[in-house]
């Protein structure tokens, strides 16, 4: 028997459990609420919006598919299916990477840019009404600090902006 197997599990204390349960509920319900808003207002899934928004912030509105999958926290296979749907709507095109032909780039079209610009206000309002309006300025700063600390454990880059782009005003 290994030392790790001999150690007792680190069960949650009642206080930890009392804080974990609402956080777990938030982690389940918030994505669904954001997805519902995006579907209702823009006809996009939240994942599709994140893909379009990420491209809207990239230099030349272009990213490698592999980098886009990482940024959107999805598999390359899932991203490929989403990009195919977005291509069908004329919002994205795929092009061979000029720097390295082994890669494929996703490029946001002008119509895709217009879709992001049209979709962003509803998304921002949902973020405000569901999260920001419920917190004081100090609580929001504290939540941001906590989220960055946890995100760094999940993704060593800690790149929050890449994970949730375009929650700011568009030019």
Where are these regions (language model features)?
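N-terminal leader segment of winged-helix/HTH proteins
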Residues: 1-42, 89-91, 170-171
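Charged, amphipathic alpha-helical coiled-coil/dimerization segments
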Residues: 2-8, 84-142
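Hydrophobic alpha-helical core bundles mediating ligand binding, dimerization, or RNAP-core interactions
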Residues: 16, 20-38, 52, 116-135, ...
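N-terminal helix-turn-helix DNA-binding core of bacterial DNA-binding proteins
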Residues: 32-75, 162
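Short, hydrophobic-biased segments on the C-terminal half of alpha helices
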Residues: 65, 83-84
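C-terminal regulatory/oligomerization modules of transcriptional regulators
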Residues: 1-14, 137-171
